[in-house]
Amino acid sequence: PLAADTSKEWIPYDKRKYPVLFTGSYMNSATFLHNAKQCAGIDQPFFEQMVQKLLDRPMLTQSRAVWECIRDRKADLTKQEQKEIENNLPSMLHTQYFFDMYIRCILREEMLIQLLKSGIDVDVYGHNWELFIEYAKLVVPDGGKIHYHGEVFYDRLPEIYADSQIVLNILPWFKDGMHDRIPMGMNNGCVTVSDSCDYLEENLQDGENILF
């Protein structure tokens, strides 16, 4: 797991500035999908099959999903087409980055949209969130608000987390580790709300030191 720092200043929980915080970058999921489909080496049917499989079964690893997709497709392919898939496997595995990033784009949007629909404001630090604000105004015109504070260097995060009550996290698509937003929140007295993975379920207790 990644380490995280503790702020030099400890702020009492009920005095903290940010009720709900998310830190990270933003890219519109539709834009990312369009760009990914323009990349050389992207097998579009495979890409769409992989994304759907991972969204349907979030605890599935990417490598396992790749093999399941290949197995599923082989049943309907000729021997020549099966051979082509096997030959293209290295490039197909290389594109796992795109699956991970695209799904994170989707989940970040969905998480924040649902909070806004519930009337919950969210404070955000990171890159590109002005684009999400425009999107959110169209989708949730009368809900909660995004308060965008711009980009900051990583070494400022401990003091920002120490001034936050609840920290949100969306994991990258690995199952045997965690993102540093989680220990950063814990080290600075935040309630950390995250999706789950094998590592977190083995090492943390839902409702005790994290909320899934």
Language-model segments: residues:
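Catalytic core of nucleotide-activated saccharide and alditol-phosphate transferases
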Residues: 1-83
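A Trp-anchored, charged/polar loop motif used as the substrate-binding/catalytic surface
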Residues: 3-11, 105-107, 149-155
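A general structural signal for short secondary-structure junctions and capping/turn motifs
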Residues: 10-14, 107, 112-116, 158-160
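Residues that mark the start of a beta-strand
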Residues: 17-19, 121, 209
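A conserved nucleotide-sugar
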Residues: 45-66, 77-80, 87-92, 105, ...
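Active-site rim elements
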Residues: 96-105
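Catalytic binding pocket for nucleotide-activated donors in carbohydrate/polymer assembly enzymes
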Residues: 102, 116, 124-212
